[in-house]
From Swiss-Prot:
Protein's gene: moaC
Organism superkingdom: Bacteria
MF GO annotations: cyclic pyranopterin monophosphate synthase activity
Keyword Lyase: yes
Species classification: Bacteria, Bacillati, Bacillota, Bacilli, Bacillales
Name of the protein in its database record: Cyclic pyranopterin monophosphate synthase
Residue sites binding substrate per the record: 75-77, 114-115
Functional description taken from the UniProt entry: Catalyzes the conversion of (8S)-3',8-cyclo-7,8-dihydroguanosine 5'-triphosphate to cyclic pyranopterin monophosphate (cPMP).
EC number: 4.6.1.17
UniProt enzyme class: lyase
Species of the source: Macrococcus caseolyticus (strain JCSC5402) (Macrococcoides caseolyticum)
Length: 158
């Protein structure tokens, strides 16, 4: 499948018609990360950030973003998502980096890759927003699709 599906015969943007696609369970896992300094790391793990629980707020922001993906990505279908999970893992072997995993699931006619990517991205952006007073030099990314399952194109694993 090397054809772009979001364009009509005139080369204009369109939202793909999925009404003929079969309903199936679809899952997507996206990942992102943010590199922070030691002060931010210590604030987060000790719950000492002045704006509150950084990871708790970021987790809720990521869930909200995944739920609202069709409002910010023009050709995404509004979906009834059956589950969203966002988890965090620290790597302090070479600095301070938070790895973000966003898993999204639905039963429907189109996939949830964009919802997972949007959720992971918004989570990282929220961590940045809540800690930028300490250091604006944080680095976000890479952000990428790790896995998807369901649908006619089958599974994808990075």
């Amino acid at each position: 499948m090397n054809q772009l599906t979001h364009f009509n015969e005139q080369g204009r943007a369109k939202m793909v018609d999925v009404s003929d696609k079969s309903v199936s369970t679809r899952t997507a896992v996206a990942k992102s990360s943010i590199k922070v300094n030691e002060v931010i790391h210590d604030q987060i793990i000790n719950h000492k950030n002045k704006k509150g629980d950084v990871l708790g707020v970021a987790q809720v922001a990521g869930i909200m973003a995944a739920k609202n993906t069709s409002q910010i990505i023009p050709m995404c279908h509004p979906l009834n998502l059956s589950g969203i999970d966002i988890s965090f893992e620290w790597d302090i072997s070479d600095g301070y980096e938070i790895f973000i995993t966003c898993t999204v699931k639905t039963t429907g006619q189109t996939g949830v890759e964009m919802e997972a990517l949007t959720g992971a991205s918004a989570t990282a952006l929220t961590i940045y927003d809540m800690t930028k007073a300490v250091d604006k030099g944080m680095i976000i990314g890479p952000t990428y699709l790790e896995h998807k399952s369901g649908g006619k194109n089958g599974d994808f694993n990075r």
